[in-house]
């Protein structure tokens, strides 16, 4: 009883002391460590990706060799909502991911992925819009101008992240051996404040994914409005993947929460004048990268059947789609293409506070990198003013290409359409399909199973890697288009939909 009386006597004093303390709270958090156990050395700003000369560890015990492969890569994105202007001029309500790091890179059509030292430089820009009409209240003139650093201030994350989404989402590109930290911050549903939508990131096709980072809400974390979560990945085998939100996938994919992702092979980092067959053999010294065709039916990169003695740097080639060991996936220029579709009725119902009809979902607007023809051939780098008056990058990724005759083009094609199969055809430039779903088309004996065609067909959730070789192709404009006539329009009689141009000079 005495203790209770003492407690009551001191309670008012304790409460007064608590009132005097400063209050602080922050749910947005961004993570990008400069070093880890796998990558103990800091890569300074401006560093190139480390060369691949030997495994970082050998044998089952992973004995360190002193060689550090790959790097720490980071990227930051927002999840929210907004509107898109479709090719018929209508405003379409959408959900979307947007950039919160690498804004300068993304505005120029490049991946927003950066090494840790560049990512961790503070973001500092004088204006919120590219037209330089809306001053940024958090701008610090005393600090260097930096459009690519991560945005970590909560107020700035809202200033930049709201109404700043794109379809497809910010492009992600990493290398084999990289550790990748991806932070997603949920900035809320500004146009539908009645919605308390959670968002996640699902790395589609990631093998043996940890459920904690897989983005499926039943077994992992879902990010509430005002919260952040950092996903961690050790880069998988090279190939073309994609990513999307895994909250009610038919809805969130249909509404636009889809993005492109590809992993570059170690072979790109092999020193000049190295035999690619020998370099691929070197990977067999590390159990983490070894490909034992006699014991592992999932071996992704078997050695070629014959050593072609292709040397790194031959005819200037240092870029490949896969660890092929024979140079057969070499390319000069790459163009990531993501196919997507909109059902305008589904989006309209979602905008007007009504229950959405999943059984009746049927896409009628078809997109290449977020564009329908004729916008597919418009130059990248355009801007669109949102309802808040801020002009933001609009579809910064190009969906057309201009090349010199003789160059090899790598098309990284993925399909995130929810309701339709999609076909793309190329007339005049033959297609060589080299990979399906991030797996090189090669049997376990090392025989390449590539095939030539003039059209490819994908279902939602599939990817293809295609080489277009312009050797012997006459200069001119060539079309990449769908032969499905109802997909070659913008829900109208005139041409539109899935069509773009490749110009050979």
Give residue spans per PLM region.
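Copper-binding active sites and cupredoxin-like electron-transfer domains
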Residues: 25-505
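N-terminal signal peptide c-region/cleavage motif recognized by signal peptidases
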Residues: 20-24
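Sec-dependent signal peptide recognition
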Residues: 8-16
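N-terminal secretory signal peptides that target proteins for export/translocation
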Residues: 1-8
